[in-house]
């Protein structure tokens, strides 16, 4: 089975630089994935990407060295299994608030004896190899999103679930959970403390700490806090920010448009 290079990056003490694809188009995904990302995550939770679009995007990303990942819309067996069968080499699941929810997610994403995933890989065999079923539990990554006070409270028990590779922080939802405006670079002390605590606890257990950011400056800050899986905004936001700054610069204005939210 094709190896998941993200595991080796982490093993070597490196940081995963992850792209985020929200435009439901295979050509856009292909161009974006050629930027040099370690991985590109297709987002099926927020935005217009459905399974059919995601399938073409997975194929497009596979023309590059980027590892194809997906964020599922919810902790649902059907879509979790379909995306893994389609060749996603990892999944990020939103709103995991309890150990039981994490166990359910892992069960859907792992073949027996670790889980209850049904046998039926289709495109995954073309991408990963005929022995996919033998190595999928070891190569495919599963991340639980921590973005609520409940998830934060239950972090230790969530991280104890066998078969879970790490967590992924949604700073905007986490900020809102603390009664603050949504932002990818929180300034509130409570939210910052929560972000730091999540990384500290996760890394102490030898697991991967992931987080969404608004760009390189915030990503580097999160690296300093212990995060080793870092997303830099998304393709739609990157396109709009870059285009807006091109227009401003051409007009002699300050090219200072930045990504404030997702």
What does each model-found stretch correspond to?
Residues 1-262:
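Expand to "…catalyze enediolate/carbanion chemistry for C-C bond making/breaking, isomerization
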